[in-house]
């Protein structure tokens, strides 16, 4: 519980209230959206069909298919975001290492001294 001096922490209802339709419209441009959607749909259909082939009732097979779709979409989304984060971190490390290897002063002589050396 918060004291009178502390602001209240936003809850899950506040998070849902802050969502806009434009947030969902731009979701398809997220790099992990396509991979997550395809993986979850294929897994959900696969598990649902397997349950149908095993002579489960249609409602139970649909429940298993939807549950698998929902679970795999979360797992795939988080896995993709984790891989993207690792790639970004590795890229930043390589940039830092390359910047450290580049000499700050390539030559202690001025450009004019270098040109005079070639003309001799």
Swiss-Prot record:
Pfam families: Cox20. GO terms for biological process: mitochondrial cytochrome c oxidase assembly. Belongs to the COX20 family. It is a single-pass membrane protein. This is Cytochrome c oxidase assembly protein cox20, mitochondrial. Signal peptide: none annotated. The chain crosses the membrane at residues 37-54. One of its GO terms (cellular component) is mitochondrion. Its main location: mitochondrion. Keywords: Membrane, Mitochondrion, Mitochondrion inner membrane, Transit peptide, Transmembrane, Transmembrane helix. Involved in the assembly of the cytochrome oxidase complex. Required for the maturation and subsequent assembly of the mitochondrially encoded cox2, the precursor of subunit 2 of cytochrome oxidase. Residues 98-120 are annotated as: Disordered. Residues 55-120 are mitochondrial matrix. PANTHER family: CYTOCHROME C OXIDASE ASSEMBLY PROTEIN COX20, MITOCHONDRIAL (PTHR31586:SF1), CYTOCHROME C OXIDASE PROTEIN 20 (PTHR31586). It is found in: Mitochondrion inner membrane. It comes from the Eukaryota.
């Amino acid at each position: 519980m918060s004291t009178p001096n502390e602001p209240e922490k936003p809850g899950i209802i506040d998070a849902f209230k802050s969502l806009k339709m434009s947030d969902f419209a731009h979701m398809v441009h997220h790099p992990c959206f396509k991979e997550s959607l395809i993986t979850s749909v294929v897994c959900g259909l696969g598990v649902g069909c397997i349950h149908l082939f095993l002579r489960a009732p249609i409602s139970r097979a649909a429940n298993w298919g939807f549950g698998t779709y929902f679970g795999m979409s979360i797992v795939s989304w988080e896995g993709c975001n984790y891989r993207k984060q690792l790639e970004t971190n590795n890229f930043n490390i390589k940039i830092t290492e390359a910047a450290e290897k580049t000499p700050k002063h390539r030559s202690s002589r001025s450009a004019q001294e270098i040109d005079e050396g070639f003309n001799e």
